[in-house]
């Protein structure tokens, strides 16, 4: 609830600033995708400070005034009536951006200026014909989750955020008194909020979700180039391109330039975020019944697989964010960028690196250990050392080594060298790295 209290204080500051100075807008858009807690925040604010709340959900916008206040046929009449309240209330309007017929509602809103403070709860920022403030609600992060659940292991926090994208509505489904594996069975059940969230979002965005489900399932299971998706789905490539653009517009698609099997740089397509990857890979094929009969051993096997397919990918994103912010801890001679696909996924004398970058005086090596249950092992570093020093002396190489677990003692000793940075999950969630998670 600390997150909600923080947003509530931010909203209260907007309201207070407006009434004290009259120089700030009389309306705020409270933005956040489904499940971020917009309605929870409105409820919390109303309990603390009073006000009014109206939802346009399942209502024709033109008909809504009659529902909200008997005898009011038009929005201007409704606003005139509630504007007579003497205590200058804060008025919340929920589900506003669901409506295509909201022109009269928007045009009539200025009648409340000076009489009330208006908060619009929306998923996406709306264009309005008058000034407004914005509060953007974002997802929970690993540091937030660990702060609220101090007994929670960092690895389980990583897993939780990885498969929920930190969406509060989904995170709260977890019982952190149980193991991560024990949480999966009720989480993936056909009547759980985890299962229903995807269905609801797909129906909201598409008239025929079934068409897009095929492509999202294909992407989640390894068909990531447009030619592969076309072959998998049976759709011509031009139709795939059209559907991919629609998925992108809905915020459900991410693209990455990376090497294909032949080493050529190609566009690869993925469901956006770990929740959608998890849902389409593990929940969608069996429509929520996958885990109902699974026993402890099978659940643990599923956790093992998810660690390799979902969790490690999220961990890598955290590592890249840390690297962009902190590479100067080992490299002081200039600026580095790590987004060139030609420098990603490079083999050096039989050892694969996540990134290899040549500079005038050094070679930069990045290795992210892809077993999230382990620390960086001695044998792996010895292979790295042998492969890289065959190209260039050790002191001319700079190594960034990441692992979720604490590295072995041998590798921990190596971190004392100026050209080696060893980073684990526990150090990543420190206070100084909060923005590393906020960028995800």
Give the ranges of each region predicted by the language model.
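Domain-level recognition of nuclease-like catalytic cores that cleave nucleotide substrates
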Residues: 398-440
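Conserved small helical "lid"/interfacial subdomain of P-loop NTPases
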Residues: 132-159
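Walker A/P-loop nucleotide-binding motif
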Residues: 24-43
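N-terminal pre-P-loop "Q-motif" helix
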Residues: 3-18
